[in-house]
C-alpha cells in the first residue's frame, strides 16, 4: 500500500461519502473506500485500476463529473499542476471538503499553503513521512480553463520557427530542456517510414521530425494525459499531422517502426525511476523494422551504451554537450 494511501486510511471516516481521489496510486485504496472514485492521468496506473476496479477511475486531463462530497489531491511534483487540480476540484465542491496528501520530501508542507485560496487549511495527520491537509471550500473559484494555462513558446530552428504548447505538469513546462535541445540539432538522416517520438512530453521532437520528414508517418507516445494533450496542441499549432497515444512504455508502441527518437523519462512523481528508459533500450528491437534506428539523448553519466549494444546493436555517440549525449543504434 502506498504510504499516502495509508495516511488516508488512518482517517477513513472522512471518506465514507462519495469522494474523488485525484492522482491516486494503483493500490488497494479503492477497495478500502467503496464510495470513492479515481481520477488518473497516468496511463499505466489507470490500466491497473481499470483491471481491478472497472468503471471506478477515469483517465483524463479534466476532473470527472460526479456528486462528490469531498475530493483528495495526491500532491504531484509540479506546482502548476497542483494549482490546476486544486482549483478544478474546489470549483466542484462549494462548501465541501478538499484534502491534500503528499510526502514530506515531495513538498507537502509548502504545498499546503496552496489550499489557503479556498479556506483555512488544517493539518489532520502526519505519518509514514507524509502529511494530510484539509480545507472546507469557502471560496469556490470558477472552473479553470486548462487551455488558458498553457505556456506557448517558439524555437528558432534552422528550418524555421517551431511553436510549442505546454500544459501544467508536462516535463520542462514552458521551456526547452537541455537534452532535447541537443537532440534537436542531430535529427538529420533518419530512416523514412513510420517514426515514433517516445516519451513525447510537449511534442517538440515529434513536431520537428514530422516537419523535416513530411512523407513519414508520425506517432507520439507518452504515459501522461497532460503530455498527450500538449503534443496534440503542439502539432496543431504547427499545422502538422500525427497520431498521439497514451501508453505505459514501449510495450504500447506500434511495431515495424523506421525510427524511434526519444529523450526518455526517468522520473515518476518525486522519485527517480529508470524503468521506462531501460525497457525502451531492451525492447526497441521488437518495435523497429530491420534497419530501423533508435536515436536518443540521455545524461552522460547513464551507462546506456552497453544496454543498447546488448539488446539492439552497435551504439555510436553522435554528439555530446552540457552533460548529455546523443546515441544511435540500428536493428540488424
Swiss-Prot record:
Its EC number is 2.1.1.172. It comes from the Bacteria. It is found in: Cytoplasm. It catalyses: guanosine(1207) in 16S rRNA + S-adenosyl-L-methionine = N(2)-methylguanosine(1207) in 16S rRNA + S-adenosyl-L-homocysteine + H(+). GO terms for molecular function: 16S rRNA (guanine(1207)-N(2))-methyltransferase activity; nucleic acid binding. GO terms for cellular component: cytoplasm. Its main location: cytoplasm. Keywords: Cytoplasm, Methyltransferase, rRNA processing, S-adenosyl-L-methionine, Transferase. Belongs to the methyltransferase superfamily. RsmC family. Monomer. Specifically methylates the guanine in position 1207 of 16S rRNA in the 30S particle. This is Ribosomal RNA small subunit methyltransferase C. It comes from Pseudomonas paraeruginosa (strain DSM 24068 / PA7) (Pseudomonas aeruginosa (strain PA7)).
Amino acid at each position: 500500500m502506498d504510504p499516502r494511501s495509508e495516511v488516508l486510511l488512518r482517517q477513513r471516516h472522512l471518506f465514507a461519502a462519495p469522494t474523488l481521489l485525484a492522482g491516486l496510486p494503483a493500490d488497494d485504496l479503492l477497495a478500502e473506500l467503496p464510495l470513492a472514485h479515481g481520477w488518473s492521468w497516468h496511463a499505466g496506473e489507470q490500466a491497473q485500476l481499470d483491471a481491478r476496479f472497472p468503471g471506478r477511475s477515469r483517465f483524463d486531463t479534466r476532473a470527472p463529473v460526479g456528486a462528490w462530497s469531498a475530493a483528495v489531491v495526491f500532491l504531484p511534483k509540479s506546482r502548476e499542476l497542483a494549482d490546476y487540480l486544486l482549483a478544478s476540484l474546489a470549483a466542484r465542491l462549494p462548501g465541501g471538503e478538499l484534502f491534500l496528501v503528499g510526502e514530506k520530501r515531495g513538498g507537502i508542507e509548502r504545498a499546503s499553503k496552496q489550499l489557503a485560496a479556498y479556506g483555512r487549511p488544517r493539518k489532520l495527520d502526519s505519518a509514514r513521512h507524509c502529511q494530510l491537509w484539509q480545507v472546507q471550500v469557502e471560496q469556490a473559484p470558477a472552473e479553470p480553463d486548462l487551455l488558458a494555462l498553457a505556456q506557448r513558446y517558439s524555437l528558432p530552428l534552422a528550418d524555421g520557427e517551431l511553436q510549442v504548447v505546454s500544459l501544467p505538469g508536462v516535463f520542462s513546462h514552458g521551456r526547452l530542456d537541455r537534452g532535447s535541445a541537443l537532440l534537436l540539432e542531430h535529427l538529420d538522416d533518419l530512416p523514412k517510414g513510420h517514426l515514433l517520438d517516445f516519451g513525447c512530453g510537449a511534442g517538440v521532437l515529434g513536431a520537428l521530425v514530422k516537419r523535416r520528414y513530411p512523407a513519414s508517418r508520425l506517432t507520439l507516445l507518452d504515459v501522461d494525459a497532460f503530455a498527450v494533450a500538449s503534443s496534440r496542441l503542439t502539432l496543431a499549432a504547427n499545422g502538422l499531422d500525427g497520431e498521439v497515444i497514451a501508453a505505459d512504455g514501449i510495450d504500447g508502441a506500434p511495431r515495424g517502426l523506421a525510427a524511434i527518437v526519444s529523450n526518455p523519462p526517468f522520473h515518476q512523481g518525486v522519485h527517480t525511476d529508470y524503468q521506462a528508459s531501460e525497457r525502451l533500450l531492451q525492447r526497441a528491437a521488437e518495435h523497429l523494422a530491420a534497419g530501423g534506428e533508435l536515436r536518443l539523448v540521455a545524461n552522460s553519466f547513464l551507462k546506456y551504451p552497453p544496454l543498447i549494444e546488448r539488446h539492439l546493436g552497435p551504439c555510436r555517440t553522435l554528439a555530446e554537450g552540457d552533460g548529455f549525449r546523443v546515441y544511435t543504434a540500428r536493428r540488424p
